[in-house]
């Protein structure tokens, strides 16, 4: 099975991406990556509102599948309970199904791929390469400050687990960012700035995808 990794590189921000078909529809996929507390969720909501993208969170899709009580959901729940990593193919299948069901052709995929294996599997299985990767760059100190300061009732927002999550991000997700950076497909955002300023930077990147930017 051929990989799209060697497909001709295209300039990020252009609609012309190689082999990006979902059924009979050409699609635009943007991977959204950043450490815990980097502000990805807030900005994804802004992008959805202003640019007509569908926001897909791999974690949310897995949780929804577990909640559905399906056979697949039970299998996912058992794997998580046993501390095993859910196979990439399972997550990718959920992402594909959500993309098809949405009827849209522009997608933000948030928090995935988490590692190189995820990335390679996504490209091999879907034959879709991202138009670009939106990377929310933020120091560990700032992310820690934000996570400890917000009150979302998340049990995993204590200092030790925050540091563990950050370490996992650096070890697993940064190689994905480096891979796409070598292909000139990373749009880096200074996520330490105030939310409105961050969105100004985001808007400049997404301008070609505005509904009236034909």
Swiss-Prot record:
<feature type="region of interest" description="NMP">
    <location>
        <begin position="57"/>
        <end position="86"/>
    </location>
</feature>
<dbReference type="InterPro" id="IPR033690">
    <property type="entry name" value="Adenylat_kinase_CS"/>
</dbReference>
<dbReference type="GO" id="GO:0046705">
    <property type="term" value="P:CDP biosynthetic process"/>
</dbReference>
<dbReference type="GO" id="GO:0006207">
    <property type="term" value="P:'de novo' pyrimidine nucleobase biosynthetic process"/>
</dbReference>
<dbReference type="InterPro" id="IPR027417">
    <property type="entry name" value="P-loop_NTPase"/>
</dbReference>
<feature type="binding site">
    <location>
        <begin position="111"/>
        <end position="114"/>
    </location>
    <ligand>
        <name>a ribonucleoside 5'-phosphate</name>
    </ligand>
</feature>
<feature type="binding site">
    <location>
        <begin position="84"/>
        <end position="86"/>
    </location>
    <ligand>
        <name>a ribonucleoside 5'-phosphate</name>
    </ligand>
</feature>
<dbReference type="GO" id="GO:0036430">
    <property type="term" value="F:CMP kinase activity"/>
</dbReference>
<feature type="region of interest" description="LID">
    <location>
        <begin position="149"/>
        <end position="157"/>
    </location>
</feature>
<keyword id="KW-0539">Nucleus</keyword>
<dbReference type="GO" id="GO:0005524">
    <property type="term" value="F:ATP binding"/>
</dbReference>
<keyword id="KW-0665">Pyrimidine biosynthesis</keyword>
<comment type="function">
    <text>Catalyzes the phosphorylation of pyrimidine nucleoside monophosphates at the expense of ATP. Plays an important role in de novo pyrimidine nucleotide biosynthesis. Has preference for UMP and CMP as phosphate acceptors.</text>
</comment>
<dbReference type="InterPro" id="IPR006266">
    <property type="entry name" value="UMP_CMP_kinase"/>
</dbReference>
<feature type="binding site">
    <location>
        <position position="63"/>
    </location>
    <ligand>
        <name>a ribonucleoside 5'-phosphate</name>
    </ligand>
</feature>
<dbReference type="GO" id="GO:0005634">
    <property type="term" value="C:nucleus"/>
</dbReference>
<dbReference type="GO" id="GO:0006225">
    <property type="term" value="P:UDP biosynthetic process"/>
</dbReference>
<feature type="binding site">
    <location>
        <begin position="37"/>
        <end position="42"/>
    </location>
    <ligand>
        <name>ATP</name>
    </ligand>
</feature>
<dbReference type="GO" id="GO:0005737">
    <property type="term" value="C:cytoplasm"/>
</dbReference>
<dbReference type="InterPro" id="IPR000850">
    <property type="entry name" value="Adenylat/UMP-CMP_kin"/>
</dbReference>
<feature type="binding site">
    <location>
        <position position="193"/>
    </location>
    <ligand>
        <name>ATP</name>
    </ligand>
</feature>
<comment type="subunit">
    <text>Monomer.</text>
</comment>
<keyword id="KW-0808">Transferase</keyword>
<feature type="binding site">
    <location>
        <position position="118"/>
    </location>
    <ligand>
        <name>CMP</name>
    </ligand>
</feature>
<keyword id="KW-0547">Nucleotide-binding</keyword>
<dbReference type="GO" id="GO:0004127">
    <property type="term" value="F:(d)CMP kinase activity"/>
</dbReference>
<dbReference type="GO" id="GO:0036431">
    <property type="term" value="F:dCMP kinase activity"/>
</dbReference>
<keyword id="KW-0963">Cytoplasm</keyword>
<feature type="binding site">
    <location>
        <position position="154"/>
    </location>
    <ligand>
        <name>a ribonucleoside 5'-phosphate</name>
    </ligand>
</feature>
<keyword id="KW-0418">Kinase</keyword>
<protein>
    <recommendedName>
        <fullName>UMP-CMP kinase 4</fullName>
        <ecNumber>2.7.4.14</ecNumber>
    </recommendedName>
</protein>
<comment type="similarity">
    <text>Belongs to the adenylate kinase family. UMP-CMP kinase subfamily.</text>
</comment>
<dbReference type="Pfam" id="PF00406">
    <property type="entry name" value="ADK"/>
</dbReference>
<keyword id="KW-0067">ATP-binding</keyword>
<feature type="binding site">
    <location>
        <position position="165"/>
    </location>
    <ligand>
        <name>a ribonucleoside 5'-phosphate</name>
    </ligand>
</feature>
<dbReference type="GO" id="GO:0033862">
    <property type="term" value="F:UMP kinase activity"/>
</dbReference>
<feature type="binding site">
    <location>
        <position position="150"/>
    </location>
    <ligand>
        <name>ATP</name>
    </ligand>
</feature>
């Amino acid at each position: 099975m051929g990989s799209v990794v060697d497909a001709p590189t295209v300039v990020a921000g252009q609609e012309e991406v190689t082999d990006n078909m979902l059924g009979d529809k050409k699609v635009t996929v943007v991977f959204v990556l950043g450490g815990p507390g980097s502000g990805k969720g807030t900005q994804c909501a802004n992008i959805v509102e202003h640019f007509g993208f569908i926001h897909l969170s791999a974690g949310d899709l897995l949780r929804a599948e577990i909640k559905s009580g399906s056979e697949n959901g039970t299998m996912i729940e058992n794997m998580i309970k046993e501390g095993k990593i859910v196979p990439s193919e399972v997550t990718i299948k959920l992402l594909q199904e959500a993309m098809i069901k949405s009827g849209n052709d522009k997608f933000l995929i948030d928090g995935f791929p988490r590692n190189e294996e995820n990335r390679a599997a996504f490209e091999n299985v879907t034959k879709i390469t991202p138009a670009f990767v939106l990377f929310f760059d933020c120091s560990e100190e700032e992310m820690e400050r934000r996570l400890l300061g917000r009150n979302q009732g998340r049990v995993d927002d204590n200092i030790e687990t925050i540091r563990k999550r950050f370490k996992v991000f650096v070890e697993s997700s940064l190689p994905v960012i480096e891979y796409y950076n070598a292909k000139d497909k990373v749009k880096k955002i200074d996520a330490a700035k105030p939310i409105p300023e961050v969105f100004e930077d985001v808007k400049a990147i997404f301008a070609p995808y505005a509904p009236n930017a034909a």
